[in-house]
């Protein structure tokens, strides 16, 4: 554990890209930080940074070391959490990368329930698109990911999956509100506001539009599902979201309906972690709670037909 502080300095230089900026972030002089890293490199036996005219970046040996640093930090957090369990006091920290749809309702409730039972546990919630969430797991930036339609899944160990049909969101007075299930063609006949291309909802809509021979032509494109939800009340427009990010009680002036899976395939909301990673106790227990909650949500879901 004697190198833990040095590892923090190395991470700071990696993030900042220079000794000077990292020294400012870590409240240490640049000369002292440079000396600390040089001493570590001498002991390690290899240089870990490329010294470039405009800064520093990890070389291949440094990348290997960074993997070790992240693994060691994870192991230490897990042992600390286990030690807290032995004393009868649940402590620890849970970091989770998630899609925007989890922010309004599902995740706040789940965190509050967990913290009510274990107030010593803290949380970090990182809002990520589907590629960024997987990257967070790979770099140990997040313990868990709860993401809609992940891209690669190579190192993504799926813990639980919840089917999520794409829903159209519109003003309460829209003619679309008169139908239980919508066809994509009817939605696209209205002005539409779409999520940006990195998001799983957009990916499924692109598939559906190609299937029926139409192009997606948004009047507004945004990275914010919150903007989509509020904008449709300002204009006779149609937006899109998944059920876990929608509730009937959210606003009186907007409504939503599922789009038929004959047009748009049902997507998957996946809870996962990095393959072969042993999670800290708090994160593992929170994952168990999420599995229970997601399983209950699946039992109440309605087919889209």
Model-inferred region functions:
Residues 11-29:
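Short helix-boundary/capping micro-motifs
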Residues 15, 41-58, 63:
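A short LG(V/I)-centered, amphipathic sequence patch enriched
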Residues 106, 255-300:
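A late-sequence structural motif
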Residues 129-134, 138-142, 147-148, 198-257:
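Hydrophobic hinge/microswitch elements
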Residues 153-192:
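Flexible hinge/capping segments at coil-to-helix
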Residues 177, 191-212, 279-288, 293-303:
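Secondary-structure junction motif
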């Amino acid at each position: 554990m004697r190198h833990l502080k040095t590892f923090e300095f190395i991470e700071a230089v990696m993030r900042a890209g220079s000794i000077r900026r990292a020294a400012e972030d870590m409240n240490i002089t640049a000369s002292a930080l440079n000396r600390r890293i040089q001493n570590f490199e001498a002991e390690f036996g290899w240089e870990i940074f490329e010294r470039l005219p405009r800064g520093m970046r990890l070389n291949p040996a440094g990348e290997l070391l960074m993997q070790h640093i992240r693994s060691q930090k994870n192991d230490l957090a897990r042992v600390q959490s286990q030690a807290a369990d032995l004393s009868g006091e649940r402590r620890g920290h849970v970091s989770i990368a998630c899609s925007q749809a989890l922010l309004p309702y599902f995740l706040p409730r789940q965190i509050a329930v967990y913290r009510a039972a274990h107030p010593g546990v803290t949380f970090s919630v990182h809002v990520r698109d589907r590629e960024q969430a997987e990257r967070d797991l790979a770099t140990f930036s997040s313990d868990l990911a709860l993401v809609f339609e992940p891209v690669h899944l190579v190192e993504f160990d799926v813990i639980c999956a919840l089917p999520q049909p794409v829903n159209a969101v519109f003003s309460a007075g829209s003619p679309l509100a008169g139908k239980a299930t919508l066809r994509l063609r009817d939605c696209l006949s209205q002005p539409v506001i779409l999520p940006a291309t990195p998001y799983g909802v957009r990916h499924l809509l692109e598939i559906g539009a190609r299937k029926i021979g139409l192009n997606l032509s948004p009047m507004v494109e945004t990275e914010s599902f919150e903007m989509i939800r509020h904008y449709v009340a300002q204009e006779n427009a149609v937006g899109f979201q998944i059920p876990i990010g929608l509730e009937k009680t959210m606003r009186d002036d907007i409504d939503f309906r599922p789009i038929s899976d004959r047009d748009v395939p049902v997507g998957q909301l996946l809870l996962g972690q990095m393959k072969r990673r042993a999670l800290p106790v708090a994160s593992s227990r929170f994952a168990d709670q999420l599995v229970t909650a997601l399983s209950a949500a699946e039992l109440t879901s309605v087919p889209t037909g």
